[in-house]
């Protein structure tokens, strides 16, 4: 039977109309009508930081395909007895996709469980399109990302009035590179709240580049496995970022949060200021 589902990503890029079978469902819809595979964000690590929708998808799964190198086993254990568990740390996309397609075509509820949020460094597009090519729809369940968990653990805000109003999520170039316009030097020039994933292996060059654009005493939060039982989190001056990382032997599951906001927590937002009017609180 010919596929009736088209890749929504290709349709956008090629300016084609989307097939109704893969149109994005309204946010209020708790159960996607056409989906047979759910790509679910597991959040930063702690099971109680799952969204309710993510937890429900996992508990209802017949097949759980999960990133066992990054997702907490406690989260995978939420799946029902009898659920087929497939660990993907040693598999390629060419091995994972056919498995999901096979199970979904049998009418089973398949959950692809990713760490953090699937929309960030989650190989999402190739999975969505690969499933669509096989006539299988997808729904994506967001997850809390490491930068949010880190800011929460620090009890801090990343957007401070008069200091910084922009958050940048990126990574060091590394083996796979980044587009030239998004190199770290260009991003650092913004002096925004800069959240760096997948960068611990390159911390020396990262620090060198950042010091060209941020003061050397700019606070840097270094977070390792934030929200896991073995979480380690410390704020250090930018000039010590590499040394501390290397002392701790951090090479993976590490987030760097570089931000002037970490040093300016006393500033007040206008949102609740008596002098600030808005639609719901007009001038008195």
Give a label for each model feature.
Residues 2-141, 149, 242:
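Class I S-adenosyl-L-methionine
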Residues 71, 146, 202:
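Short phosphate-engaging motifs
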Residues 77-78, 153, 209:
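Residue-level signal for well-ordered alpha-helical positions
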Residues 46, 117-190, 234-235, 284:
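Class I SAM-dependent methyltransferase SAM-binding "motif I" and its flanking Rossmann-like core
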Residues 68, 89, 142-144, 173, ...:
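Residues at the C-termini of beta-strands that transition into short coil/loop
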Residues 2-39, 95, 106-110, 129, ...:
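A contiguous loop/helix-start segment that scaffolds small-molecule binding in enzyme catalytic cores
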């Amino acid at each position: 039977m010919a596929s009736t589902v088209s890749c929504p990503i290709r349709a956008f890029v090629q300016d084609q109309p989307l097939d109704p079978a893969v149109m994005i469902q309204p946010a209020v819809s708790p159960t996607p009508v056409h989906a047979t595979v759910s790509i679910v964000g597991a959040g930063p690590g702690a099971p109680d930081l799952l969204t309710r929708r993510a937890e429900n998808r996992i508990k209802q799964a017949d097949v759980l395909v999960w990133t066992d190198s990054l997702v907490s086993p406690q989260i995978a254990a939420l799946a029902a007895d009898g659920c087929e568990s497939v660990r993907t740390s040693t598999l390629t996309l060419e091995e994972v996709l056919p498995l999901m397609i096979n199970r979904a075509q049998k009418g089973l509820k398949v959950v692809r469980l990713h760490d953090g949020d699937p929309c960030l460094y989650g190989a999402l597009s190739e999975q969505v399109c690969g499933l669509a090519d096989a006539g299988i729809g997808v729904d994506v369940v967001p997850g809390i990302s490491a930068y949010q968990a880190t800011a929460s653990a620090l009890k801090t805000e990343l957007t401070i009035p008069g200091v910084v109003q922009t958050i940048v999520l990126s990574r060091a170039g590394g083996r796979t590179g980044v587009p030239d316009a998004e190199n770290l030097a260009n991003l650092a020039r913004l002096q925004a709240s800069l959240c760096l994933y997948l960068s611990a292996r390159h911390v020396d060059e990262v620090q060198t580049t950042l010091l060209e654009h941020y003061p050397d005493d700019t606070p840097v939060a270094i977070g390792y496995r934030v929200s896991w039982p073995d979480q380690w989190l410390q704020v250090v001056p930018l000039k010590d970022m590499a040394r501390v990382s290397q002392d701790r032997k951090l090479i993976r599951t590490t987030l760097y949060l570089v931000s002037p906001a970490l040093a300016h927590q006393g500033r007040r937002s206008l949102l609740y200021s008596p002098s600030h009017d808005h639609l719901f609180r007009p001038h008195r």
